[in-house]
């Protein structure tokens, strides 16, 4: 009898109903025993035709679609779209609105990373971080609700500014949150960072070199974990980021553990950014004074018939955007989220193209997981931080 047993390759379906699939991901795996030889990701199970739907909506009506792309960090998407429309309109945003945008975008980054780290830990088998982190996420979602009226799909950041100003007591509560939050992060650090099992499951798993990361179009924490200090908030500053002080956390190896460390460090940097904004935020309007874009105040509408007509026209017909095309990208929690709009001089976009960071990261899963064990795949997927709303669009 031969000592060598021939292992026949096996095809395995991972998802789309798998708890570690982070949504509706389907992977077709070619296995050589317990080792992954090839991965074929199947996308499109959450395709809703967002880009096409936007062509039939006015510029303001198109905004809520962006909340529903990466539904874990909604305000970052609204921000990219609003900046893009403002660039076409050549519209100036009040300074207080810029500060509010940065505050909520950085809270969104914390919201996103808390979910990612907790779900990555849960996939590997650590349950405590999920319970702890969801308690903190709830506080941020509460801030969302107090600012916009909605916990998730807020439609708060709009072309021309933000939907409404926030009350003084909300600023006070956010301040209290950022003062107590670093202590919570220290607790999470003590739970995971030097944990023996956590390190065994993440160190040297899914290693990506600098060259590979650039070739695959990585951005965000996925790129920075490879040692490339690329952050749009520093390299192509928008809003008031050039006035704020923050570091760009980078990794060394580009493995799952480095990606975790980068996200942990980014949470701390975001806390610092929110604190700086709260200390500096000036008084003033939160919407542009261009009445062709911003609706009149409620108090004005109660007195003036013209204001009421204006409000109705603005929300039914929308505003005309000058013909042209532009691309605008923001440093979303998952990477570079870009919006490309072509305007034909009407009240609806002629074409809107969305550049989702998760799409590029999912493409590289075959390269990252090849040669690893099946059990390591959950750690790799967790570290990718993918949400199918933005990948399938």
From Swiss-Prot:
Pfam families: Complex1_49kDa. The keyword Repeat does not apply. It catalyses: a quinone + NADH + 5 H(+)(in) = a quinol + NAD(+) + 4 H(+)(out). It is found in: Cell inner membrane. Signal peptide: none annotated. Keywords: Cell inner membrane, Cell membrane, Membrane, NAD, Quinone, Translocase, Transport, Ubiquinone. Gene3D superfamilies: Cytochrome-c3 Hydrogenase, chain B (1.10.645.10). It is an enzyme of class 7 (translocase). Belongs to the complex I 49 kDa subunit family. PANTHER family: NADH DEHYDROGENASE [UBIQUINONE] IRON-SULFUR PROTEIN 2, MITOCHONDRIAL, NADH-UBIQUINONE OXIDOREDUCTASE 49 KDA SUBUNIT. NDH-1 is composed of 14 different subunits. Subunits NuoB, C, D, E, F, and G constitute the peripheral sector of the complex. This is NADH-quinone oxidoreductase subunit D. It comes from Ehrlichia ruminantium (strain Gardel). The lineage of its organism: Bacteria, Pseudomonadati, Pseudomonadota, Alphaproteobacteria, Rickettsiales.
């Amino acid at each position: 009898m031969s000592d060598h047993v021939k292992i026949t390759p096996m095809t395995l379906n991972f998802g789309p109903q798998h708890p570690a699939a982070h949504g509706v991901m389907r992977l077709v795996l070619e296995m050589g025993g317990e080792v992954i030889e090839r991965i074929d990701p199947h996308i499109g199970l959450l395709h809703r035709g967002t880009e096409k739907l936007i062509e039939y909506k006015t510029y303001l009506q198109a905004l809520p679609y962006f909340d529903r792309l990466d539904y874990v960090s909604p305000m970052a998407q609204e921000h990219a779209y609003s900046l893009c429309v403002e660039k076409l309109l050549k519209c100036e945003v009040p300074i207080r609105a810029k500060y509010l945008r940065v505050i909520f975008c950085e809270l969104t980054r914390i919201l996103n990373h808390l979910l990612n780290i907790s779900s990555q830990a849960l996939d590997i088998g650590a349950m405590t971080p999920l319970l702890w982190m969801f308690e903190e996420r709830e506080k941020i979602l509460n801030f969302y609700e107090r600012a916009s009226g909605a916990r998730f799909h807020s439609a708060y950041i709009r072309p021309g500014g933000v939907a409404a100003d926030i009350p003084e007591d909300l600023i006070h509560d956010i301040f209290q949150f950022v003062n107590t939050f670093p202590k919570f992060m220290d607790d999470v650090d003590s739970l995971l960072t030097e944990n023996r099992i956590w390190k065994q499951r993440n160190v040297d798993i899914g290693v990506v070199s600098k060259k590979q990361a650039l070739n695959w179009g990585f951005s965000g924490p996925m790129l920075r974990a490879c040692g490339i200090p690329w952050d749009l908030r520093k390299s192509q500053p928008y809003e008031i980021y050039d006035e704020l002080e923050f570091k760009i956390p980078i990794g060394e190896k580009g493995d799952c553990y480095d990606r975790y460390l980068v996200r942990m460090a980014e949470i701390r940097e975001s806390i610092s950014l929110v604190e700086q904004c709260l200390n500096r935020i000036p008084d003033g309007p939160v919407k542009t004074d261009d009445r062709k874009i911003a609706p009149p105040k409620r108090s004005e509408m109660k007195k003036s018939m013209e204001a009421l007509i204006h409000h109705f026209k603005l929300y039914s017909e929308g505003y005309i955007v000058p013909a042209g095309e532009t691309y605008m990208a923001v440093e979303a929690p998952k990477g570079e989220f870009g919006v490309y709009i072509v305007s034909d001089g009407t009240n609806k976009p002629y074409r809107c193209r969305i550049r989702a960071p998760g799409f590029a990261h999912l493409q590289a899963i075959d390269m990252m997981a090849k040669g690893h064990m099946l059990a390591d795949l959950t750690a790799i997927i967790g570290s990718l931080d993918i949400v199918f709303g933005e990948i399938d669009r």
